[in-house]
C-alpha cells in the first residue's frame, strides 16, 4: 500500500510525493495490480442510468447494476456509511456515502451519492434505491482489489479520517486512526491508476476548488449538488449547468451526483462544491483514464467542450 500526502501534477499525469508502507513502491504500482472498476451514473426520475462497459457508456437499470455487484460476493465483513442514515435523520458527520466489503482475499468499495442508502445490507444483497432518492441523478463507483496489494486496515483508516456515520456493520476490525494533523489530505493508492483522497471535517477547505486542483494547470469541470452558498468562479474550474447523457438532457439542479473531469482524469466522490461543505469530511477517488475522461467530457454538450 502506498500513502501520500502532497499531490503534485506533472504534465498531464498525477504524481505524488509518497511514503511506502507494507509493500514496496514497485510492487504496489505493478501492471497486474489494476483490480476491478465499475462506473455508473443514474439519470433523474427513475432507475435508468448508464454504466461504463468496453470503453463506452451503455444503458443500465441502476438497481440491477447494484444487485449484480453483490450477488456473487462472499464477504466475511462489511460496513456502510452515509451522512443521511436509513432511519431518516440527517447528521453533520462526514459528507460521504459508501459500502465497504471484504473477505480473506479481496476488498470491495462502493462510493455513491444516495442518501439513506442502503436501507438493508447483508453482504451479498441490498435493498433497492428508495423512491425519494430516484428523483435526482446519482453517481456510483465500485472498485475491487486484492488484499495482496492493499491493507484492509489502511482502507478503514482512510474512511475513518472523513468521520462518517457507520451502520450495517459486520465483523469490523479495530483500527488505529491516523496520527497526524487534520490539515492533511490523506491519499491512498488503490491501484496504479486510482487513488483515494480523504479530507477531515477539521480541515476547513474547498475540496474541489482547492485540494483537487493543487498543482494543477488543467481545467476541471465539476458536477455536484448545489443548495446553498456557492463559490465565485475562479480559474481552472467550471461548474456544469446542463448535461446530456444517453439522449437525456437535464440541469445540474436535478442531479445529486458528485464528479469532476479533466482531459485525463475523473474524480467521483462525496463532496459538493458549496461553502458549507468546507466543514464536512469527505473525499473520493481520482481515476487516470483517457477514455473514461473523454466519455465524461462528452456529456458537457452545453459547454461546447471538445477534447484536444
Where are these regions (language model features)?
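PLD/PLD-like phosphodiesterase catalytic module centered on the HKD motif
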Residues: 1-308
Amino acid at each position: 500500500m502506498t500513502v501520500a500526502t502532497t499531490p503534485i501534477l506533472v504534465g498531464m499525469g498525477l504524481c505524488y510525493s509518497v511514503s511506502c508502507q507494507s509493500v514496496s513502491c514497485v510492487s504496489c504500482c505493478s501492471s497486474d495490480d489494476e483490480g476491478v472498476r465499475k462506473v455508473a451514473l443514474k439519470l433523474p426520475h427513475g432507475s435508468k442510468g448508464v454504466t461504463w462497459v468496453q470503453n463506452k457508456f451503455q444503458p443500465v437499470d441502476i438497481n440491477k447494476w447494484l444487485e449484480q455487484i453483490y450477488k456473487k460476493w462472499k464477504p466475511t465483513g462489511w460496513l456502510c456509511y452515509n451522512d443521511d442514515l436509513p432511519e431518516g435523520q440527517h447528521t453533520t458527520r462526514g459528507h460521504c456515502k459508501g459500502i465497504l466489503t471484504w473477505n480473506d482475499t479481496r476488498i470491495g468499495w462502493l462510493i455513491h451519492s444516495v442518501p439513506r442508502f442502503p436501507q438493508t445490507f447483508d453482504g451479498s444483497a441490498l435493498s433497492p434505491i428508495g423512491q425519494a432518492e430516484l428523483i435526482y441523478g446519482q453517481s456510483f463507483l465500485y472498485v475491487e482489489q486484492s488484499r495482496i496489494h492493499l491493507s484492509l486496515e489502511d482502507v478503514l483508516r482512510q474512511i475513518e479520517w472523513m468521520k462518517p456515520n457507520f451502520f450495517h456493520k459486520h465483523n469490523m476490525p479495530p483500527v488505529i486512526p491516523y496520527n497526524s494533523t487534520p490539515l492533511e489530505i490523506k491519499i491512498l493508492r488503490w491501484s496504479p491508476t486510482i487513488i483515494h483522497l480523504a479530507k477531515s471535517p477539521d480541515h476547513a477547505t474547498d475540496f474541489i476548488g482547492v485540494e483537487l486542483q493543487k498543482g494543477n494547470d488543467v481545467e476541471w469541470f465539476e458536477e455536484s449538488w448545489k443548495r446553498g452558498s456557492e463559490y465565485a468562479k475562479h480559474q481552472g474550474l467550471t461548474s456544469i449547468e446542463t448535461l446530456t447523457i444517453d439522449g437525456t438532457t437535464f440541469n445540474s439542479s436535478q442531479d445529486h451526483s458528485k464528479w469532476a473531469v479533466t482531459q485525463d482524469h475523473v474524480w467521483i466522490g462525496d463532496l459538493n462544491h458549496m461553502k458549507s461543505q468546507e466543514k464536512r469530511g469527505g473525499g473520493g477517488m481520482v481515476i487516470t483514464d483517457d477514455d473514461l475522461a473523454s466519455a465524461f467530457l462528452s456529456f458537457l454538450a452545453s459547454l461546447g467542450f471538445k477534447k484536444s
